């Protein structure tokens, strides 16, 4: 649901493209 918190969720392929993961 929220990819930015915690930041480690950025490893998820659905979250990775999000600006907060850049």
From Swiss-Prot:
SS bond partners: 3-15, 4-20, 10-21
Entry-linked Pfam families: Mu-conotoxin
Modified residues (4-hydroxyproline): 6-7, 17
Protein name as it appears in the record: Mu-conotoxin GIIIB
UniProt keyword annotations, A-Z: Amidation, Disulfide bond, Hydroxylation, Ion channel impairing toxin, Neurotoxin, Secreted, Toxin, Voltage-gated sodium channel impairing toxin
Domain statement: The cysteine framework is III (CC-C-C-CC).
Entry's Gene Ontology cellular component terms: extracellular region
Key word Cytoplasm present: no
Function: Mu-conotoxins block voltage-gated sodium channels (Nav).
Chief subcellular location: secreted
Annotated tissue distribution: Expressed by the venom duct.
Superkingdom of origin organism: Eukaryota
Record GO terms (molecular function): sodium channel inhibitor activity; toxin activity
Signal peptide bounds: none
Protein family (similarity comment): Belongs to the conotoxin M superfamily.
The keyword Secreted appears for this protein: yes
């Amino acid at each position: 649901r929220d990819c930015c918190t915690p930041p480690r969720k950025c490893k998820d392929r659905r979250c990775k493209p999000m600006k907060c993961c850049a």
